[in-house]
From Swiss-Prot:
Chemical reaction(s) catalysed: 5-amino-1-(5-phospho-D-ribosyl)imidazole-4-carboxylate + L-aspartate + ATP = (2S)-2-[5-amino-1-(5-phospho-beta-D-ribosyl)imidazole-4-carboxamido]succinate + ADP + phosphate + 2 H(+)
Protein name: Phosphoribosylaminoimidazole-succinocarboxamide synthase
Extent of the signal sequence: none
InterPro entries the UniProt entry points to: SAICAR_synt/ADE2_N (IPR028923), SAICAR_synth (IPR001636), SAICAR_synthetase_CS (IPR018236)
The protein's Enzyme Commission number: 6.3.2.6
Annotated family: Belongs to the SAICAR synthetase family.
Organism of derivation: Azoarcus sp. (strain BH72)
Pfam families assigned to the protein according to its UniProt record, in alphabetical order: SAICAR_synt
PROSITE patterns found in the cross-reference section: SAICAR_SYNTHETASE_1, SAICAR_SYNTHETASE_2
GO cellular component: cytoplasm
GO molecular function: ATP binding; phosphoribosylaminoimidazolesuccinocarboxamide synthase activity
Keyword Metal-binding among record annotations: no
UniProt pathway annotation: Purine metabolism; IMP biosynthesis via de novo pathway; 5-amino-1-(5-phospho-D-ribosyl)imidazole-4-carboxamide from 5-amino-1-(5-phospho-D-ribosyl)imidazole-4-carboxylate: step 1/2
Any one biological process term the GO annotation gives: 'de novo' IMP biosynthetic process
Amino acid sequence: MATPLFESTIKSLPLLGRGKVRDIYAVDADKLLIVTSDRLSAFDVILPNPIPDKGRVLTAMANFWFAKLGHIVPNQLTGIDPESVVAADEREQVKGRALVVKRLKPLPIEAVVRGYVIGSGWKDYQDTGAICGIALPAGLKQAAKLPAPIFTPASKAEVGDHDENISFAQAQANCDAVLAEALAGTGKTGAGLAEEARQAAIALYSQAADYAAGRGIIIADTKFEFGIDAAGTLHLIDEALTPDSSRFWPADSYREGISPPSYDKQYVRDYLETLDWNKKAPGPDLPADVVERTAAKYREAYEKLTGLTLA
């Protein structure tokens, strides 16, 4: 197990920003270096304890899915070795946990696909009989499989804020407003790209869910992000189908009517719910056993899904 990395310090490249988990550096005008740290956020708060190997698991899993699903939509990968774009004494920070990616203009939405009634979708369904305004059959139980996957976009939040579910019409309006300048002269519209993103997200989820089912894992829901190049071509960016962006359930313990155990940070969320904490920064320290159990869950998810062992 490698030494945990809470925050990268790449001095040889300009730092553009830090997200909840990823640190982003400029390689040149066309490319970025994205370093996936071992930071963990819960309830949109970054917690003080890194989770060993988490960044390496997320990077390896994203690479696995980018390769498997690359025929559906282009992605951000350049194929350039991250160790080749940093100084020699910085290579250990990027080894196994970084990607050199194309610089793309992000769509201003989170592309969420749900295959099961769980989480905020379950709460919404109980209140309204719908999820994000999409009407569903009556009488569904918690964790029930939906008749078909649904696309439920969310607005993108700044670090520390919460993403908010929005209607598809609002997603189209947001894309029109934010992408108008970038799309000038391409013949494309933001609303049209939102529709492309919806179709791509459902196709990505459906093929991934079929594959995962054969490995004994249910992908209950997931979140994608998309960006465009100068021609307005849609690309899959950020991460893909990782324990941070998805809800993975072991198929052998799944049943309707309960919230199934999952291969993700739910173990941390459950622990935090036992504390007297207001879910605002700063987050509380995690006990060693919670850190270790969470690290094991991430590795197990990768190994079960891919059949590979983390190097």
